[in-house]
Curated annotation (Swiss-Prot):
Its EC number is 2.7.10.2. It comes from the Eukaryota. Residues 10-102, 163-253 form the SH2 domain. SMART domains: SH2, TyrKc. The modification Phosphothreonine is found at residues 250, 338, 377, 523. Non-receptor tyrosine kinase which mediates signal transduction downstream of a variety of transmembrane receptors including classical immunoreceptors like the B-cell receptor (BCR). Regulates several biological processes including innate and adaptive immunity, cell adhesion, osteoclast maturation, platelet activation and vascular development. Assembles into signaling complexes with activated receptors at the plasma membrane via interaction between its SH2 domains and the receptor tyrosine-phosphorylated ITAM domains. This is Tyrosine-protein kinase SYK. One of its GO terms (biological process) is regulation of arachidonate secretion. Coiled coil: none annotated. One of its GO terms (molecular function) is protein tyrosine kinase activity. The SH2 domains mediate the interaction of SYK with the phosphorylated ITAM domains of transmembrane proteins. Some proteins like CLEC1B have a partial ITAM domain (also called hemITAM) containing a single YxxL motif. The interaction with SYK requires CLEC1B homodimerization. It catalyses: L-tyrosyl-[protein] + ATP = O-phospho-L-tyrosyl-[protein] + ADP + H(+).
């Protein structure tokens, strides 16, 4: 969460206020001397420590919901660095201008907090246990959903802590604290019925109770004390500083056999859990815990409805209280919750049919068409697999003239699709020869990206960034498999949910041999020229690098909410424009960094154009920065 500041030489990471003051003293305490540190109270926030009049002054920098940073009541900024630069020129509430940064001494790295140290392992274990993923499916889930998973882990980490006892009464909490050792500072936290919490603290043989309130914004605090985003941050703070309590927190109170309180809410502790509260930080005690499962992957059903029992935490929605999981309100799924994240044949009991031909008797079609084209129509259907009924999209070949070329095109597309298996690519279930040739594929209910964005202008930038990043992950996979798509456009990206995109339509796709890096077409066909790189138009040469050009156009479509590229221009006019070095302008409201990536994708010289490895990494880093 400190990624946006780690590169700054004056950023010290998660040091305490006292440590910051010590550093400023080392620097001479001259007016305007300053350093930046990570907030110990707010997720993704920072604190600015400034010397003035021989005293240290501290300002909290909160991360706003839109991803900007601001000192309370002050102007918002795109990054902590921009905020510091601004306050080097404008007071705007500070005691003095920022003049001299106090940089970290040589060899000193930003200090990571306990959660930062462990979050990679926590996320990996959480994804493994919650969605039962392994291998590439696990890695893809972590990469694409890391910001959401970080928030999920951070805001629910207290449920796995030894000091959190769930819903127990005040009397029960006193009994538990008084069992065993009577060490001063022994403590536990319990949940109260109104959504707040209470701290039980042992002092001189008596249990003191402190209320932990939760305000409308979700901030937690002991009355009169500091605000915190999470319970574990609150506990970490009061473990090194009493700050209004009679004493600091020392020893967490263990659950009795892991069976007290609300066991449906709280995971059972492993029997090997250590009984002592040794050095190493509060969070270090959750390494060996098993995570509760908020939901499982969506089960297939003919109706395509999501059972209430499978509803899981949705990090895209605002917090609705600590007991939101107990409510039956519908929440939107993460990609891993959907039935199309993994291949239907990932289940070893589901045997892939030989030569991918399906039994027509097991396929049911709806009458309503989802779409149509020169090839025929697409309908929604249901395919009876061995264990489940799977909702599918069926491309039905319209071949009244019995043209063998049309059948060959469909079979060629099927041949490409059967070789691909990635969460961000529409998978083929199989092909069916009956009243017509049919290509049976995974269903993406929300349809093409361009049409969805045209009809849903409320979709925010960070949601669009999330979707185009997923597309880049799918294209990186194609690049690694030596496939060229040749028809990458927003119309061929289908949405499973508002937060889950898949690449489709492999009718023009080609597999390259291991010794090839491009495909050369023999003739000019009915090509989507406005999405094509100059070398495709001029020399009929197609490669992953030409797909990168198309991806830049797709990004432009997405950030312009489904508008047509080069509107009103003919293909020849577009070619002339590109030859002159001109490119489409930045869509209104599009982040500067995203337009810069588009123009990089539109590099004329194919050798200097980035590949999808570089494009995906750049998108990933920006996505993490704006969503965190």
């Amino acid at each position: 969460m400190a990624d946006s500041a780690n590169h700054l030489p004056f950023f010290f990471g998660q040091i305490t206020r006292e440590e910051a003051e010590d550093y400023l003293v080392q620097g001479g305490m001259s007016d305007g001397l300053y350093l930046l540190r990570q907030s110990r109270n707010y997720l993704g926030g920072f604190a600015l420590s400034v010397a003035y009049d021989r005293k240290a002054h501290h300002y909290t920098i909160e991360r706003e919901l839109n991803g900007t940073y601001a000192i309370s009541g002050g102007r918002t900024h795109g990054s902590p660095a921009e905020l510091c630069h601004y306050h080097s020129q404008e007071l705007d509430g500070l005691v003095c201008l920022l003049k001299n940064p106090f940089n970290r001494p040589p060899g000193v790295q930003p200090k990571t907090g306990p959660f930062e140290d462990l979050k990679e392992n926590l996320i990996r274990e959480y994804v493994k246990q919650t969605w039962n993923l392994q291998g590439q499916a696990l890695e893809q889930a972590i990469i694409s959903q890391k910001p959401q998973l970080e928030k999920l882990i951070a805001t629910t980490a207290h449920e796995k802590m030894p000091w959190f006892h769930g819903k127990i009464s005040r009397d029960e909490s006193e009994q538990i604290v008084l069992i065993g050792s009577k060490t001063n500072g022994k403590f536990l936290i319990r949940a109260r019925d109104n959504g707040s919490y209470a701290l039980g603290l042992l002092h001189e043989g008596k249990v003191l109770h402190y209320r932990i309130d939760k305000d409308k914004t979700g901030k937690l605090s002991i009355p009169g004390g500091k605000n915190f985003d999470t319970l574990w941050q609150l506990v970490e703070h009061y473990s090194y500083k009493s700050d209004g309590l009679l004493r600091v927190l020392t020893v967490p109170c263990q659950k009795i056999g892991g069976q007290t309180g609300n066991d449906s809410f709280r995971p059972q502790l492993p029997s090997a859990h250590p009984a002592t509260w040794s050095a190493g930080g509060i969070i270090s005690r959750i390494k060996s815990y098993s995570f509760p499962k908020p939901g499982h992957r969506k089960a297939s059903s003919p109706q395509g409805n999501r059972p209430e029992s499978l509803v899981s935490y949705n990090p895209y929605e605002s917090d609705r209280g600590p007991w939101a999981n107990e409510r039956e309100a519908q929440r939107e799924a993460l990609p891993m919750d959907t039935e199309v994240y993994e291949s239907p044949y990932a289940d070893p009991e589901e045997i892939r049919p030989k030569e991918v031909y399906l039994d027509r008797k097991l396929l049911t079609l709806e009458d309503k068409e989802l779409g149509s084209g020169n090839f025929g129509t697409v309908k929604k259907g249901y395919y009876q697999m061995k264990k489940v009924v799977k909702t599918v999209a069926v491309k039905i070949l319209k071949n009244e003239a019995n043209d063998p070329a049309l059948k060959d095109e469909l079979l060629a597309e099927a041949n490409v699709m059967q070789q691909l298996d990635n969460p961000y690519i529409v998978r083929m279930i199989g092909i069916c020869e009956a009243e017509s040739w049919m290509l049976v594929m995974e269903m993406a209910e929300l349809g093409p990206l361009n049409k969805y964005l045209q009809q849903n202008r409320h979709v925010k930038d960070k949601n669009i960034i999330e979707l185009v990043h997923q597309v880049s992950m799918g294209m990186k996979y194609l690049e690694e498999c030596n496939f060229v798509h040749r028809d990458l456009a927003a119309r061929n990206v289908l949405l499973v949910t508002q937060h889950y995109a898949k690449i489709s339509d492999f009718g023009l796709s080609k597999a390259l041999r291991a010794d090839e890096n491009y495909y050369k077409a023999q003739t000019h066909g009915k090509w989507p020229v406005k999405w094509y790189a100059p070398e495709c138009i001029n020399y009929y040469k197609f490669s992953s690098k030409s797909d990168v050009w198309s991806f830049g156009v797709l990004m432009w479509e997405a950030f312009s909410y489904g508008q047509k590229p080069y509107r009103g221009m003919k293909g020849s006019e577009v070619s002339a424009m590109l030859e002159k070095g001109e490119r489409m302008g930045c869509p209104p409201g599009c982040p500067r960094e995203m337009y810069e990536l588009m123009t990089l994708c539109w590099t004329y010289d194919v050798e200097n154009r980035p590949g999808f490895v570089a494009v995906e990494l750049r998108l990933r880093n920006y996505y993490y920065d704006v969503v965190n």
